[in-house]
Amino acid sequence: ELDGLIDIYLPDLKYIRPNKSMRYSKAYDYFDKASLALKEMRRQVKDEFDGKIMKSGMIIRHLILPQNTNSSIEILDYIKSNLPDTYVSLMAQYTPCGDLSDYPEINRKITKREYDKVLNYALYNSFDKLFIQELSSADKSFIPKFDFTGVL
């Protein structure tokens, strides 16, 4: 029970389709589990944002993947229908790393066209609690080394 312990939730919602979640994360029931968790998080916290800083609430982060714009739109539809008035962060930072020879369809950054399709859909459908990233955020310089540098 986390009621009253968490001020801000920043959950990711990557997939809505089981075939995608199974292929990329080996989690066929990803959306079933994630959607339940999101509803519980939403129940626990109410948004308090003064225009500069969020004091409490939830921001659902969605990473747009190459060749998956229709899935991104389905996720936006889900949020609009089931978690209205929830902040959404559309992330353009996908940067392919490692050996993706088994996943050639995501072995590239998203294109401006893909990004614009999802962003325009969100704007057209009145997502007024929306954070966005620039396409330039998809750069390996933003990826930490994961070598414990700076960890006490």
Model-found features: residue ranges?
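Core AdoMet radical
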Residues: E1-E48, I132
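Auxiliary Fe-S-binding modules of radical SAM enzymes
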Residues: K46-L152
